[in-house]
């Protein structure tokens, strides 16, 4: 791996303010093709990408997300787990393929495929000089997103991605990640609680200092406090029901 690629990936951070400069159709096509070059399990290609250009559709999706950059960006992509085309093949096939794509394993396979495509696109966009931000907030109301985007059965909107030229006011920076030794385990998982807690305490201090410096002391919370706040909300508890309605996790 070249130093350029390494530094490009290490400098990733979410961009939430964009210039009013739409991406051209050629750029959009290149990004999608770069995404499609990602690995795909068993050549299934279990994804579709919806490019949202209509301002009225963007506005409706913004209502679901609650984030202004769903509307104000260079381009909005929505990444869809898609077994609809496989269902069409299944209708004329001799075997019952729904047993596979309607299973929990089918969901995992498809979701991984979508994530790989999206990350390929993210890196390609950043290489072009654009900023990106992922939009898991589109899952705030899956049923409404399905209606807005006219999604058929056997599809599921996983997340969006806003892309565009970063605003001159944009001053984001990469957040410190968990240290290498904490997330990389040789041969077997190291579940030593004492060691893990010790490493987390050190990481909490790093994160707290990062926020303190970035905000002139306005924010000082650490990583453990953040995940306690986020995971303690117990949001989107309807997801299993929504997945089943779309034809997933039948077994």
Swiss-Prot record:
<comment type="function">
    <text>Reduces FMN, organic nitro compounds and disulfide DTNB. Involved in maintenance of the cellular redox state and the disulfide stress response.</text>
</comment>
<dbReference type="GO" id="GO:0016491">
    <property type="term" value="F:oxidoreductase activity"/>
</dbReference>
<dbReference type="InterPro" id="IPR000415">
    <property type="entry name" value="Nitroreductase-like"/>
</dbReference>
<comment type="similarity">
    <text>Belongs to the flavin oxidoreductase frp family.</text>
</comment>
<keyword id="KW-0285">Flavoprotein</keyword>
<protein>
    <recommendedName>
        <fullName>NADPH-dependent oxidoreductase</fullName>
        <ecNumber>1.6.-.-</ecNumber>
    </recommendedName>
</protein>
<dbReference type="InterPro" id="IPR029479">
    <property type="entry name" value="Nitroreductase"/>
</dbReference>
<keyword id="KW-0288">FMN</keyword>
<keyword id="KW-0560">Oxidoreductase</keyword>
<dbReference type="Pfam" id="PF00881">
    <property type="entry name" value="Nitroreductase"/>
</dbReference>
<keyword id="KW-0521">NADP</keyword>
<dbReference type="InterPro" id="IPR016446">
    <property type="entry name" value="Flavin_OxRdtase_Frp"/>
</dbReference>
